[in-house]
Amino acid sequence: MTILFILCCGIGRADASTLDARQNLSFGTLIPVANSGSVIVSTAGAVNTGGNVTVAPSGTSYYQGKVRFTPTLLNVFTVRAADSSIVLNNTSSGGGSVTVDNFTVNPSSLNITVLGAVDINIGGRMTFSASSKSGTYTGSVRIEVSSLLAGTLSVNLPVTLTLWDSLKMNETTPLFFGVLEISSGASVVQLNAQTGQRSVVSGSGNVVLSTGQASTAGRFKIKGQPNTSVSVALPSSVVLTGNKGGTMTLDNFNGYPSSTQLSLDSSGDGNLNVGANLNIGASQLSGTYNGTYSVTVNY
């Protein structure tokens, strides 16, 4: 009697494909100009702020996320973000959180006919609210590459965002030249931004600096992102109008500590003083003169 044994065996190779995070999905450094809103970073690295934020002139740039897939099998693979939405938490002392969703991947399908590394770009939408304080926000989204033959590979891609405080400015003291006694000649009175004191720079015989009311420099308090610099813009001239008629011009505006730039301290606070020159005409009418001037600060 002959017994025939048939032995069957499968010979295969374990899939050694890899999926690695190469570049964070970064929403950059943003300054909210609204209480809430969304910002989109595309898979091409373009940003759409929707008018809800401005991009800070310094700090982290925005860019799309990248993962690298290195296959060892010739196959068709599907790419997706396994998380529909994630929460980024503020790692700074301010607290708060933001949400990131609407993840996009490019390419979303891979037909591997030649082995080699493939980079996959990741985009998404970040939504902030009034409770999203300044600071650095971090989290991660899970990216998957899968096929029926190879199974599923996944990697956690870091997602980052930095929010700065928006700038706020308040006038605490008005720019005031005090009381001036004038004669028939023209003169120019300068108000020093640092000291708030007046001096006659032209036509000294035509004006007396009365001590009845103290002059004051314009004083402003600025609040913003700690340890940053802001630009300062002062007007070239403004016109004051008298209650009995007549006008006078203010020009040569100057700021202290600077007319062009201001550094905010570790608490985000800064102080700016403003002075100017008052041009008094030869036949200037007496009275009380008032006007407004603008001060602009920007990151």
Regions found by a protein language model. Give the residues of each.
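N-terminal small/polar-rich segments of proteins
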Residues: 14-80, 111-232, 261-299
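C-terminal segment of classical bacterial N-terminal signal peptides
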Residues: 5-14
